[in-house]
From Swiss-Prot:
Organism annotation: Roseiflexus castenholzii (strain DSM 13941 / HLO8)
UniProt keyword annotation of RNA-binding present: yes
Keywords: Endonuclease, Hydrolase, Nuclease, RNA-binding, tRNA processing
Record-linked Gene3D superfamilies: 3.30.230.10
Gene Ontology molecular function: 3'-tRNA processing endoribonuclease activity; ribonuclease P activity; tRNA binding
UniProt family annotation: Belongs to the RnpA family.
Reaction(s) the record says it catalyses: Endonucleolytic cleavage of RNA, removing 5'-extranucleotides from tRNA precursor
Gene symbol of the encoding locus: rnpA
Protein function: RNaseP catalyzes the removal of the 5'-leader sequence from pre-tRNA to produce the mature 5'-terminus. It can also cleave other RNA substrates such as 4.5S RNA. The protein component plays an auxiliary but essential role in vivo by binding to the 5'-leader sequence and broadening the substrate specificity of the ribozyme.
PROSITE patterns the UniProt entry points to: RIBONUCLEASE_P (PS00648)
Name of the protein described by the UniProt record: Ribonuclease P protein component
Enzyme class: hydrolase
A Pfam family it matches: Ribonuclease_P
Amino acid sequence: MKRAYRLRTPEQYQRVRRDGRTWDAGMLMLNAAPNRRRISRCGFIVAKRLGGAVVRNRIRRRVREAVRLLYPQIAPGWDMVFIARSPALAEIAFPQLQALVQRLLQRAGVVQGAVSETPDKD
């Protein structure tokens, strides 16, 4: 993903986590907050408890690629943080991962033309 489409600073992540809404899909969680910009930005969190550096980087790369492929469908004006919650994300088939990400984006209502569901957590 291009640098302009990524969250970079801890303050940006904290704002999304604090002000945004949360949707949970078991292995992956999404926090999303409006950003008043013409673009949507994404960030990715993979905790150390999910495995060593190789596993964490593999999860981060795979989730980032799934989001990159779906990015044209995402409406502008959102900041999103994807939080990996399972080491299985490193091993599941990529089409399954892509479907999981797409389902989260649709539930959050950030896909162009989608309507948001009630979040799992506030």
